[in-house]
């Protein structure tokens, strides 16, 4: 039976052992151990049995260069495929590879056209325009017949109840909101006219309710007309009596 030392001597030549002993590492860094030195030149051993030796593993270093992350000019990180799958296992290597794919997609998205960047995003200009349109109401354009009907009703009734508003809106072909808005604007003009005509106070309260006796009712208007007619009749009777007395 052959001694193990003799087998080792058969695997490695004597000059290789001398070169290994002659070289001393200056530090214990991995880079110092794994880098090649000019004075350490070992002829590669031959034979199928030598490929599993310690020196063969250290000299070949199949995965040393791949473990260092390299970045090309585009800034895309490239991860090794075979070392991770061999050393880290399937779950961890698949997770890292998926992360690398995400980095590649994210970095390459900078070179995509503008329409691809904006895909799936709302246009802020269109959103702002829609908000302004929602805040503003379109101005209603009334016809002459509608304006005449509203003015006649406003002369008789400055404030409308809900049933009156519904009836007026249906008769004129308008909505209740349109009638209400028109009445509010018309009352504001009416208040200004009253104040400009010499009125000391507005005919309505700050909350919009009319003051007492500021708006005459239909009964009061009829009584005023009756008194005016009576005054006219009395004036006409008095003038006729005076004429008869003058003739006598």
Swiss-Prot record:
Subcellular localization, as worded in the UniProt entry: Nucleus
One Gene Ontology term from the biological process aspect of the record: pharyngeal system development
Alphabetical keyword list: DNA-binding, Homeobox, Nucleus, Transcription, Transcription regulation
Signal peptide range in chain numbering: none
Organism domain of life: Eukaryota
Annotated SMART domains: HOX (SM00389)
Molecular-function GO terms, alphabetical: DNA-binding transcription factor activity, RNA polymerase II-specific; RNA polymerase II transcription regulatory region sequence-specific DNA binding
One GO location term (cellular component): nucleus
Basic and acidic residues: bias regions: 223-234
Biased composition, class Polar residues, residue ranges: 237-248
DNA-binding region, residue intervals: 135-194
Region (Disordered): 197-248
InterPro entries: HD, HD_metazoa, Homeobox_CS, Homeobox_TF, Homeodomain-like_sf, HTH_motif
Purpose: Transcription factor, is involved in craniofacial development, and in stomach organogenesis.
Protein family per UniProt: Belongs to the BAR homeobox family.
Protein name, per record: Homeobox protein BarH-like 1
UniProt organism field: Danio rerio (Zebrafish)
